[in-house]
């Protein structure tokens, strides 16, 4: 549970690797599982190599997705997954604190998803960044009984970190 919060709120990539190795034995096998599941939920143009989304190449293929597939993954996570309620709880938390096994040291995670406070009805989202992809974001909002999802890829590079927030707001307002 602590690893999931640290991964989703703080984007601690090492947590994704630990989870992948625990679930599947290796990150390679976990990536295969992710690719199989992505296809199962309708993603047509996604190929995962790393469990944390970092840039990678395997043979002639690169770790990649599309905005459409990323939105599809978010839709699954918040609407169709048997764990949707847990996903929404985790990604909607402003902060989370846990301790080491001895209880001596506390660790604090803070949610970097500024969109949660930007618009009424914002329910979930996840930030991302790599050198190849730039700043990325997928977020969801519910208003008037409808769910809206925005997925942004390559939305600025360093010195333009906040573009994703203004672009998300513009697209959400357009959809409303």
Question: What are the residue ranges of the model-derived segments?
Answer:
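Short, functionally critical alpha-helical segments immediately adjacent to catalytic or ligand/cofactor-binding
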Residues: 8-10, 17, 70
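Extracytoplasmic/periplasmic mature domains of Sec-exported, cell-envelope-associated bacterial proteins
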Residues: 1, 9-11, 30, 44, ...
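Short flexible coil/turn linkers enriched for glycine and charged/polar residues
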Residues: 10-13, 144
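Domain-terminus/edge residues, biased toward the C-terminal soluble/receptor-binding domains
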Residues: 43-44, 61-176
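Short acidic/histidine-centered micro-motifs embedded in hydrophobic/aromatic stretches
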Residues: 6, 22, 36-37, 90-94
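Short glycine-/small-residue-rich flexible loop motifs, especially phosphate/cofactor-binding loops
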Residues: 17, 35, 121
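Second-shell loop/turn segments in exported
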Residues: 2-6, 16-26, 54-63, 127, ...
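Mid-domain, small-residue-enriched loop/turn segments at the edges of structured enzyme/sensor domains
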Residues: 20-80
């Amino acid at each position: 549970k602590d690893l999931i919060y640290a991964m989703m709120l703080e984007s601690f990539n090492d947590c994704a690797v630990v989870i992948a190795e625990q679930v599947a034995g290796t990150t390679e096998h976990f990536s295969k599982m992710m690719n199989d599941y992505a296809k199962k939920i309708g993603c047509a143009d996604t190929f995962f190599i790393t469990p944390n989304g970092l840039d990678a190449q395997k043979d002639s293929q690169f770790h990649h997705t599309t905005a459409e597939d990323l939105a599809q993954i978010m839709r699954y996570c918040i609407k169709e997954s048997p764990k949707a309620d847990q996903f929404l709880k985790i990604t909607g938390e402003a902060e989370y604190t846990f301790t080491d096994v001895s209880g001596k040291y506390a660790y604090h995670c803070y949610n970097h998803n500024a969109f949660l406070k930007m618009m009424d009805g914002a329910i979930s989202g996840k930030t991302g960044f790599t050198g190849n992809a730039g700043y990325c974001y997928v977020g969801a909002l519910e208003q008037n009984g409808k769910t809206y999802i925005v997925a942004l890829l390559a939305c600025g590079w360093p010195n333009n970190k906040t573009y994703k927030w203004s672009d998300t707001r513009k697209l959400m307002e357009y959809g409303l």
